[in-house]
């Protein structure tokens, strides 16, 4: 799974996921399913945000990478992926500026057009079950919830899906392709089932004991489908901004 994650996701996303796990004392090399889940969630958050801007009239518009956008403001503020201290600083700043109610839990995004925080969910289960879990945890009508599944289903607060159909289709296609690639490598079942994940972890640990450090065949193989998985959706200008604002790791 670790090899798959490093091949499948943008290096910035992988780096952010590793940083987030280490912040909570978790090891991406051991908790590989969680590593994959965090990367997937981060990517969906970025895809949700990318190419969506607000023009000088306050209207929401979509601008593809490469188009002039100097006078445009990003519609969404990305909160997910930052360390907790910085994330709360951003949330507090938004609340002080806009007057919106401060959430009890860290949200994933802030929507400047609708003036609301957004909680993004990516589930391997039924969307309505995961939606209810999120709603029961947050217990706030002020935070908008939007859930995606790997099967193409989605659910949002008051059926308000925020984004246009094409943008949501891009996210659904990406999730479905990730699922297909995992399945083709025999990783999907363990990703979905905790029991299977534990069995797979035991197998992995046994395999690592006699040949620790040796590269696996998977790490040297990139399927044609994975080439299409390369996240070309990331706006090059925003990629640089993300690296600058999110990754503040001390140099070794």
Swiss-Prot record:
The record marks 195, 198-199 as: Important for efficient shutoff activity and nuclear localization. GO terms for biological process: viral RNA genome replication; viral translational frameshifting. The keyword Calcium does not apply. It comes from the Viruses. One of its GO terms (molecular function) is RNA binding. The record marks 202-203, 206 as: Important for efficient shutoff activity. The active site is at residues 80, 108. Plays a major role in the shutoff of the host protein expression by cleaving mRNAs probably via an endonuclease activity. This host shutoff allows the virus to escape from the host antiviral response. Hijacks host RNA splicing machinery to selectively target host RNAs containing introns for destruction. This may explain the preferential degradation of RNAs that have undergone co- or post-transcriptional processing. This is Protein PA-X.
């Amino acid at each position: 799974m670790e090899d798959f994650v490093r091949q499948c996701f943008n290096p910035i996303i992988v780096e952010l996921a590793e940083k987030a796990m280490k912040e909570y004392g978790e090891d991406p090399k051991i908790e590989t399913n969680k590593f994959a889940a965090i990367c997937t969630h981060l990517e969906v958050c970025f895809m949700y945000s990318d190419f969506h801007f607000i023009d000088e009239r306050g209207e929401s518009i979509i601008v593809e990478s490469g188009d002039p956008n100097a006078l445009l403001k990003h519609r969404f503020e990305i909160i997910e992926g930052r360390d907790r201290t910085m994330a709360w600083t951003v949330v507090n700043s938004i609340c002080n500026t806009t007057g919106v109610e401060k959430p009890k839990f860290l949200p994933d995004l802030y929507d400047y057009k609708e003036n609301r925080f957004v909680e993004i969910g990516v589930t391997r289960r039924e969307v309505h079950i995961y939606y209810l879990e999120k709603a029961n945890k947050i217990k706030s009508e002020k935070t908008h919830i939007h859930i995606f599944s790997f099967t193409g289903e989605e659910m949002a607060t008051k059926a308000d899906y925020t984004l246009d159909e094409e943008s949501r289709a891009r996210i659904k296609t990406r999730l479905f392709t990730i699922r297909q690639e995992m399945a083709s490598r025999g990783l999907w079942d363990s990703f979905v089932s905790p029991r299977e994940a534990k069995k797979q972890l035991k197998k992995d640990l046994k395999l690592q004991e006699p040949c620790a450090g040796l590269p696996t065949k998977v790490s040297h193989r990139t399927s044609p489908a994975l080439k299409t998985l390369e996240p070309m959706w990331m706006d090059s200008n925003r990629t640089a901004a993300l690296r600058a604002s999110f990754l503040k790791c001390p140099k070794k």
